[in-house]
């Protein structure tokens, strides 16, 4: 969803209600065209997140820098402020110092503005142009790349600036590799979606292939690397490459895009957007409620995968390794939780009244 289509009214929210209240609400679904949605605030997405103390001041500075750099018109600038990306990063990286937090917010704004071009922007169905833009963006991470002219290529300049600040703290070779790899996978997944749009085969794909693309295009893996850097997490490569850690990464990424597909469904219907797992499952024969229930089942399955992975995580002889691995897994969970809370607070999909109803009753009224 582009910045223009991303936000409705700002949302305030209340604690979720389960048990009898939710069951009673489900029984009333027949009175209007509505869907009963999954319990989003469960498992690793449960609990109140911690906020970074630098959120307000740094968020303002990052927004102003971006607005001037890309020469935003007043309408787009207002939308950027409303988006409040600093809140998202605040929940994902609550322990980052001011400098690291600023880099994280700049990165987050870059990611969303850059993605605009391929979502609802001019390159949403132009594969060759999109490929060229993505290759040029990734090239800014090469140490032999010349300094980008901010006037000619403001988004490339933003990303190069973020990369230079990342490098300035001397990240480990493993973290640098993860940074580059996750960004490449993310941007290539976006390119794959552009190709599907261009060829009009968005929903004519295998379910597993669709899910693999979404878990990378959502950008969660890249944000894991941002938080790992911002929190100065120092887990050794042996631990980071363990299957249990990689399963937890996959779960946190999947829960992020599944939450988005649940909460965006009402808005996707209104805008005629088909890039949603609910639509794909309906295309494959499920009813609308059946498709939404399937999303819930996938979320529950992911939560079980997380629990199993934690149970199978080895205990390293070095206690510092165990501590750092735990910090990294907490960071992955925090990214998913941050996206969930930010999605409600920012009003990116549901306005205040709609958001309250979904949180209280798990009922989403449809257009």
Curated annotation (Swiss-Prot):
Pathway(s) it belongs to: Antibiotic biosynthesis
Cofactor: Mg(2+)
Keywords associated with the record: Antibiotic biosynthesis, Glycoprotein, Lyase, Magnesium, Metal-binding, Signal
GO MF, any single term: terpene synthase activity
Segments crossing the lipid bilayer: none
Pfam annotation, one family: Terpene_syn_C_2
UniProt-listed SUPFAM superfamilies: Terpenoid synthases
Motif (DDXXD motif): 115-119
Source taxon at top rank: Eukaryota
Reactions performed catalytically: (2E,6E,10E)-geranylgeranyl diphosphate = cycloaraneosene + diphosphate
UniProt keyword Signal present: yes
EC number of the protein: 4.2.3.191
Cofactor: record remark: Binds 3 Mg(2+) ions per subunit.
Binding annotation for Mg(2+) 2: 115
Binding site for Mg(2+) 3: 260, 264
Residues in the signal sequence: 1-24
Annotated InterPro entries: Isoprenoid_synthase_dom_sf, Terpene_cyclase-like_2
Keyword Manganese assigned: no
Enzyme class: lyase
Entry note about domains: The Asp-Asp-Xaa-Xaa-Asp/Glu (DDXXD/E) motif is important for the catalytic activity, presumably through binding to Mg(2+).
Family that this chain belongs to: Belongs to the terpene synthase family.
Function per UniProt: Cycloaraneosene synthase; part of the gene cluster that mediates the biosynthesis of sordarin and hypoxysordarin, glycoside antibiotics with a unique tetracyclic diterpene aglycone structure. First, the geranylgeranyl diphosphate synthase sdnC constructs GGDP from farnesyl diphosphate and isopentenyl diphosphate. The diterpene cyclase sdnA then catalyzes the cyclization of GGDP to afford cycloaraneosene.
Designated name of the protein: Cycloaraneosene synthase sdnA
Organism: Sordaria araneosa
């Amino acid at each position: 969803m582009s910045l223009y289509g991303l936000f409705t009214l700002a949302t305030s929210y209340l604690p979720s209600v389960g048990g009898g209240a939710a069951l009673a609400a489900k029984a009333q679904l027949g009175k209007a065209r509505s869907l009963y949605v999954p319990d989003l605030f469960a498992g690793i997405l449960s609990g109140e997140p911690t906020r970074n103390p630098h959120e307000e001041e740094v968020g303002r500075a990052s927004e102003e820098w971006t607005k001037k750099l890309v020469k935003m018109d007043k309408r787009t600038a207002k939308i950027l402020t409303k988006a409040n990306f600093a809140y998202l990063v605040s929940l994902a990286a609550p322990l980052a110092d001011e400098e690291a937090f600023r880099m994280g917010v700049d990165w987050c704004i870059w990611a969303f503005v850059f993605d605009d071009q391929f979502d609802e922007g001019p390159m949403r169905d132009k594969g060759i142009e999109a490929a060229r833009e993505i290759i040029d963006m990734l090239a800014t991470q090469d140490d032999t790349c010349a300094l980008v002219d901010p006037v000619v290529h403001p988004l490339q300049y933003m990303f190069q600036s973020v990369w230079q600040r990342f490098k300035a703290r001397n990240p480990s070779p493993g973290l640098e590799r993860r940074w580059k790899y996750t960004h490449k996978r993310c941007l290539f997944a976006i390119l794959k979606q552009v190709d599907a749009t261009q060829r009009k085969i968005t929903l004519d794909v295998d379910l597993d292939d669709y899910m693999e693309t979404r878990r990378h295009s959502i950008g969660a893996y890249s944000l894991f690397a941002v938080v790992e850097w911002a929190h100065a997490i120092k887990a050794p490569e042996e631990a980071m490459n363990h299957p249990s850690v990689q399963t937890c990464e996959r779960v946190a990424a999947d829960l992020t895009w599944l939450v988005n597909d649940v909460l965006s469904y009402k808005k996707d219907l209104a805008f005629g957007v088909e890039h949603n797992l609910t639509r794909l499952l309906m295309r494959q024969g499920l009813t609308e409620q059946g498709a939404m229930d399937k999303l819930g089942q996938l979320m529950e399955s992911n939560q079980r995968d997380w629990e199993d992975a934690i149970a199978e995580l080895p205990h390293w002889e070095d206690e510092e390794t165990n501590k750092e691995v735990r910090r990294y897994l907490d960071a992955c969970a925090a990214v998913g939780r941050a996206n969930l809370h930010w999605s409600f607070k920012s009003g990116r999909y549901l306005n205040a009244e709609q958001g309250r109803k979904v949180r209280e009753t798990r009922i989403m009224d449809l257009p």
